[in-house]
């Protein structure tokens, strides 16, 4: 027979587990709602038509990805997802960042970083802020690793307006279930 203290301690542990599970499920639900919203938006949006969009400052959890090895990249992406869930209490779509200079040289399939948008600023060396401003956005159907078509469309759009493109990055927030 256990002591009342031991029983109470065990119950505290159970309550903590339940609270943790509730938090995890709420995050999952928030992610699902966000994904639904993104897919609905993408379904309504005209494809392959660049447009200017005003965006607020965003906080991104960013991880570097090794170029070269697909297996290593997959492991690093899995680690990024684990980290975002464990330390940043968020479950979100993972976007990828490409270097503008790679694309200028015709390399459309090498992404150098992955990121997840966070709900709030967090103290971590991996969290970067993307400033508020006007961005060119484009919905395109295709594969994450082939950015040639979106890049050409966005470059032409920026060129027509005499706009300088962001010095380093083009990012792709891919909805896998959207691609065909």
Where do the PLM segments sit?
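A solvent-exposed interaction/effector surface
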Residues: 4-180
